[in-house]
């Protein structure tokens, strides 16, 4: 079936049509975006600058997750911030397809990375004596390759489905971004089958990975019965951060993509949560509960202060 699109651009309704609310949206989400990119890139730089952290699979995955969060947020948030300054918010057909592809690509990669991080914690807690031999560089590289490939396949399937839809008008999207269900409502054809394919593709990757995560942590919790109280506390503290991130990311995704298409006002709020707020919260969750990351950040800060003092002394 050849794409029969006549629409050259879409109009986004955004979060609100009220000018006062749009001003608040601009200020709040500009601050959130700066904090998101700054916080996540700080973790990336910290891990890359700390050899002791970089050789650890857990921190390797954490750095990769932070990079993904910065990219994922940058796909949607900057345009949303700029659009809040305008009464009419438009996006070209090509721009809409690119946004849709990038959103699902980075989300698909992140889903698999979170699953890989759960497996890393499973091996570290349940098979500590074999951790170094199992979680070696080769396996970490394979897991990253699987994540990139899985995200690419997922986004390619979504975009190929969307390109088959004819858009002949209207062109108003009741959202602040291009997403599958709002686009299905605008298609000039019966989208029942396409809606089911969205559920199968997006819902499948969410539910399968979420199930693997649940199994991993169920096994971890069962294995903690044989650990000392100190060992249990350390394991729970390490896993707690990851569990919080998993819940914050997966629950909104499953809510949005595992149901049939319908006009549901809470979709916008769910999208704000997993696209904008979740990448902001991830650095806070991991750094506040992780002594090694905080110590590495202090060392980097101290080195910067030393370099700054040396430059001042040279000027004098």
Curated annotation (Swiss-Prot):
Compartment(s) of residence: Cell membrane
Gene3D superfamilies linked to this entry: Rhodopsin 7-helix transmembrane proteins (1.20.1070.10)
Domain of life: Eukaryota
Disulphide bonds in the chain: 96-188
TM regions (residue ranges): 24-47, 57-78, 100-119, 139-157, 195-217, 235-257, 269-288
UniProt cross-references to InterPro entries, sorted A to Z: GPCR_Rhodpsn, GPCR_Rhodpsn_7TM, Olfact_rcpt, Olfactory_Receptors
Cytoplasmic face of the membrane: 48-56, 120-138, 218-234, 289-316
Coiled-coil region: none
Extracellular side, ranges: 1-23, 79-99, 158-194, 258-268
Membrane topology per record: Multi-pass membrane protein
Keywords: Cell membrane, Disulfide bond, G-protein coupled receptor, Glycoprotein, Membrane, Olfaction, Receptor, Sensory transduction, Transducer, Transmembrane, Transmembrane helix
Glycosylation sites: 3
A single MF term (Gene Ontology): G protein-coupled receptor activity
CDD domains (alphabetical): 7tmA_OR4A-like (cd15939)
Role description: Odorant receptor.
PANTHER family in alphabetical order: OLFACTORY RECEPTOR (PTHR48002)
Family assignment from sequence similarity: Belongs to the G-protein coupled receptor 1 family.
Protein's recorded name: Olfactory receptor 4C15
Organism ancestry: Eukaryota, Metazoa, Chordata, Craniata, Vertebrata
């Amino acid at each position: 079936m050849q794409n029969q699109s006549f629409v050259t651009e879409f109009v986004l309704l955004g979060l609100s049509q009220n000018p006062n609310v749009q001003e608040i949206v601009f200020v709040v989400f500009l601050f959130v975006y700066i904090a998101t990119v700054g916080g996540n890139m700080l973790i990336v730089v910290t891990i890359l600058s700390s050899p002791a952290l970089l050789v650890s699979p857990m921190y390797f995955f954490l750095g990769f997750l932070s990079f993904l969060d910065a990219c994922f947020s940058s796909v949607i948030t900057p345009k949303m911030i700029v659009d809040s300054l305008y009464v009419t918010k438009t996006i070209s057909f090509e721009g809409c397809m690119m946004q849709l592809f990038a959103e699902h690509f980075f989300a698909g990669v992140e889903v698999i990375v979170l699953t890989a991080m759960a497996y890393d914690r499973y091996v570290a807690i349940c098979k500590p004596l074999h951790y170094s031999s199992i979680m070696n560089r080769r396996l970490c590289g394979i897991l990253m390759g699987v994540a990139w490939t899985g995200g690419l396949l997922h986004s390619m399937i979504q975009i190929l489905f969307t390109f088959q839809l004819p858009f002949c008008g209207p062109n108003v999207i009741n959202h602040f971004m291009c997403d599958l269900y709002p686009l299905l409502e605008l298609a000039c054809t019966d989208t029942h089958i396409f809606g089911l394919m969205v559920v199968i593709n997006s819902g499948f990757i969410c539910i399968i990975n979420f199930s693997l995560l649940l199994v991993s942590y169920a096994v971890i919790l069962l294995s903690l019965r044989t650990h000392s109280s100190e060992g249990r506390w350390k394991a729970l503290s390490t896993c707690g951060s990851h569990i919080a991130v998993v819940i914050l990311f997966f629950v909104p995704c499953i809510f949005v993509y595992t149901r049939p298409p319908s006009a549901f006002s809470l979709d916008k709020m769910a999208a704000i949560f997993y696209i904008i707020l979740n990448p902001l919260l991830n650095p806070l969750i991991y750094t506040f509960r992780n002594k090694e990351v905080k110590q590495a950040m202090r060392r980097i800060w101290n080195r910067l202060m030393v370099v700054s003092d040396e430059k001042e002394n040279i000027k004098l």
